[in-house]
């Protein structure tokens, strides 16, 4: 089971170590609000694709307000000069949600080499620049262990190196206990748009066992 399902979704729950990316409560309009959250997340990722965003957490504490927490490697790109970019984003979300109370919090990801989303985006960006996929994968693995990662698995699928037949290649180093629910495993995917087609990148990073009686966000 742990080998097939998404490592993040497998560990989401009130008694487990992962949390949802959208936190809201609605009796009748849950579907509408959830679709809104998806559109907001897509908008942020498209506008600031160079900021290497790790996670967008959307909270709705009431019917009149929305709180958006953005974790990114390069927060300055999202903020902009004198806060111009974040003001544009706030106005766009106000027009989309029809809410006047929109709060945006931006957090810098310091240990970005053990953040699966950022690692996957970095590998995809290197593949688009025609860097060898083996070199990109091995560089990511080495950098992960330097920042405290205990295990990492990287997979690339597609026409690797311009080959006519698509294939999948992967590297794994360290531990990767996918069946252990208390294992803190970060998982993410990315796509590299190359001249030969799309190459899919998957990254699993094991950060150790979570032993405290507290949920990991």
From Swiss-Prot:
Listed PROSITE patterns: KH_TYPE_2, RIBOSOMAL_S3
Recorded GO MF terms: mRNA binding; rRNA binding; structural constituent of ribosome
Protein biosynthesis listed as a keyword: no
Record-level GO BP terms: translation
One Gene Ontology cellular component: cytosolic small ribosomal subunit
InterPro entries, sorted: KH_dom, KH_dom-like_a/b, KH_dom_type_2, KH_sf_prok-type, Ribosomal_S3_C_sf, Ribosomal_uS3_bac-typ, Ribosomal_uS3_C, Ribosomal_uS3_CS
Domain called KH type-2: residue spans: 40-110
Top-rank taxon, per record: Bacteria
SMART domains registered for this protein in UniProt: KH
Quaternary data: Part of the 30S ribosomal subunit. Forms a tight complex with proteins S10 and S14.
UniProt family annotation: Belongs to the universal ribosomal protein uS3 family.
Protein purpose: Binds the lower part of the 30S subunit head. Binds mRNA in the 70S ribosome, positioning it for translation.
HAMAP family: Ribosomal_uS3_B (MF_01309_B)
Protein name: Small ribosomal subunit protein uS3
Name of the gene this protein is made from: rpsC
